[in-house]
Amino acid sequence: MDNNMKGKTLVISGGTKGIGKECVYKFAKNGVNVAFTYNSNQQFAEDICKDVEDKFGVKCKAYPFNILEPEKYKELFEEIDKDFDRVDFFISNAMIYGRAVVGGYGKFMKLKPRGLNNIYTATVNAFVCGAQQAAKRMQKIGGGAIVSLSSTGNLVYIENYAGHGTNKAAVEAMVKYAANELGEFG
């Protein structure tokens, strides 16, 4: 356990699968309380929280959230404020899949505005809205860390990845702007 992290709080979007779930467990193992979002499976999310609390003795809470409605981050963070006394880390991780990406994932000539817009909303807009809310709380405690997960698809060609790759490039640019403007706050 990292004693420098004990008692701090992580907020992460998309904490029930893959990298997001691994982050939930890794932070909790280091004594960090965890608030994470999930899209649809409440029971699965609650099972993760129970497991995390039992294994690591930290507080864990899961919140339903539709990443295609990033403007609702304000309400989400207001709920998190009721359950946790601080936010030290924010990871923008959740991504869309299935019907929401139709027209955004595929060959360049098959891309459609709706699919591209959905991916942009779930990556760039979600990062902006979530990071703004997290930063407001971090400023009150003297700083924190904000991360957005990305991929190499913005750097190298990956077949059928034009929609995702260009949006990952956009969110990485946005992260740089946020870092420059928020860096002075810690």
Show where each model-derived region lies.
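Conserved glycine-rich Rossmann-like NAD(P)H-binding loop of the short-chain dehydrogenase/reductase
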Residues: V32-D47
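Conserved mid-core segment of classical short-chain dehydrogenase/reductases
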Residues: K74, I96-N117, K136, N160-G163
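Residue(s) in the substrate-gating loop at a strand-loop-helix junction
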Residues: S151
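Catalytic Tyr-X3-Lys loop
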Residues: D88, M109-C129, G143, V147, ...
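Conserved glycine-rich cofactor-binding loop
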Residues: T16-K17
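Alpha-helical segment proximal to the catalytic Tyr-Lys
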Residues: K136, N180-E181
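A short, exposed helix-loop element centered on a Lys and neighboring polar residues
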Residues: A131-Q132, K176
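The beta1-alpha1 cofactor-binding region of Rossmann-like NAD(H)/NADP(H)-dependent oxidoreductases
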Residues: Q42, P64-E75, P113
